[in-house]
């Protein structure tokens, strides 16, 4: 989990557009965040396995 101060800092508008970065909506992780779902890969995988993300199925080929 991210520190509360970092989550609050991320909610404020960035001074410059290049300073803005995405965080996971669920846990606050700053790396490997899928923009479409606003979730990090770890949270995405957990929710997908539980079937809580509509339209997401496990790939098999």
From Swiss-Prot:
Similarity-based family? Belongs to the universal ribosomal protein uS14 family. Zinc-binding uS14 subfamily.
Record has Zinc as a keyword: yes
Per the record, the gene is: rpsZ
Read off the NCBIfam families from this record: PRK08061.1
Q: Which positions does UniProt annotate for Zn(2+) binding?
A: 24, 27, 40, 43
Annotated GO molecular function terms are: rRNA binding; structural constituent of ribosome; zinc ion binding
Q: Which SUPFAM superfamilies match?
A: Glucocorticoid receptor-like (DNA-binding domain)
Q: Which UniProt keywords apply?
A: Metal-binding, Ribonucleoprotein, Ribosomal protein, RNA-binding, rRNA-binding, Zinc
**Described purpose of this protein according to its UniProt entry:** Binds 16S rRNA, required for the assembly of 30S particles and may also be responsible for determining the conformation of the 16S rRNA at the A site.
- One GO biological process term: translation
Q: How does it assemble?
A: Part of the 30S ribosomal subunit. Contacts proteins S3 and S10.
* Cofactor(s) recorded in Swiss-Prot or TrEMBL: Zn(2+)
- Per the record, what is one GO cellular component? small ribosomal subunit
Keyword Protease set for record: no
InterPro entries listed in its UniProt record: Ribosomal_uS14, Ribosomal_uS14_bact, Ribosomal_uS14_CS, Ribosomal_uS14_sf
Q: Can you say what this protein is called?
A: Small ribosomal subunit protein uS14
Manner of cofactor binding, per the entry note: Binds 1 zinc ion per subunit.
